[in-house]
Amino acid sequence: MPQQHKKVLAVLSDLFFSVKIADAAKRAGMAVELVKDPHELMIKAKAKPSVIIFDLNFEDAQPLELIAKLKGSPEFKGVSLIGYLSHVQGELKQAAQEAGCDMVMAKSAFSQNLQQILKRHSGVI
């Protein structure tokens, strides 16, 4: 896998999860970049990261619109999109899946499995 693909883009505003993702990415041998602006994400996604992680509740970043744009463009084929949300948000989960999110998880499950998810995307396992 080319070096440029061993990158994580994370679209979130939560400091706790920013640190958690950065730590897990480091342990998986991946670089991580935090993005808060939709336009900035589309530019950075052109570098074809392995995975883009979305806090589906970060409304300022327009996660559903971004997911649909990314999945609708052949330029981003092969980039995995993962979203997390509260376990009680069934409608948002369905909307994210319909927009093209590859994996939608409850925040607790995402947190618990983050290390394994990133290792898988880094090519370690």
Positions of predicted regions on the chain:
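His-Asp phosphorelay/catalytic-motif detector in bacterial-type signaling
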Residues: 75-80
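Two-component/phosphorelay signaling modules centered on CheY-like receiver
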Residues: 15-33
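Non-catalytic signal-transmission and effector/linker regions of two-component phosphorelay proteins
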Residues: 1-7, 22, 117-125
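Alpha4 helix (beta4-alpha4-beta5 surface) of REC/receiver domains from two-component response regulators
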Residues: 88-103
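Conserved acidic segment of CheY-like receiver
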Residues: 6-15
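Conserved phosphotransfer microenvironments
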Residues: 54-70
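Output/docking surface of receiver
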Residues: 100-112
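Acidic, metal-coordinating helix/loop segments flanking the phosphotransfer/catalytic sites
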Residues: 36-51
